[in-house]
Amino acid sequence: AGKYILNFGADKVRKYLTETIRRMVEDYGADYIKMDYNVDSGFVDGDFENERKAYLTWVGEMRERFENVLFEACSSGGMRMDYETLKHYSIVSTSDQVRDYLYPYIAGNVLSAALPEQAAVWSYPVSSKDVWTPSDGNVSSEKVVLNMVNAFLGRIHLASDLTKLSSENFALVKEGVEY
């Protein structure tokens, strides 16, 4: 199973994706769209710079057309953290790292590439041994606090099943958000 990058220089691609975005916004009421373009740029077959320009031009057109929609970029391991890309997005997801003890390295350095209000820092107060599926008994107050502190440097993006939190730990999340 290979990965493919769409050629935004092709009218067919732009028309298809423009219609897809239109449907999401106008028919389904989407006001937040994450553009998870998490593909290594080495997969581009041809002129990388023109492909990139065509993609970013299209993103700019979508932001102009749907000005009330927040478009989030994926940092793709830092490959999409350049100012040319960031100026086309409201928000950039800095990482989907779920290991709370590793995120401080990302959160502490991301501001060298993105503005705090643009840098989405994910907080996973509920996790289960570093995997996506939460379980009871694996949520400590220390883990909750570290996840919230990690997110303070940017725009907090809460994730995971918060209903699994005890009332004490939920209060810590609430305090972190209010802070």
Outline where the language-model segments fall.
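Active/binding-pocket-proximal capping segment
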Residues: 38-41, 77-80, 168-169, 176
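Non-catalytic C-terminal accessory modules of carbohydrate-active enzymes
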Residues: 159-179
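Active-site groove signature of glycoside hydrolases
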Residues: 16-45
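Glycan-recognition surfaces
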Residues: 1-15, 19, 26, 52-53, ...
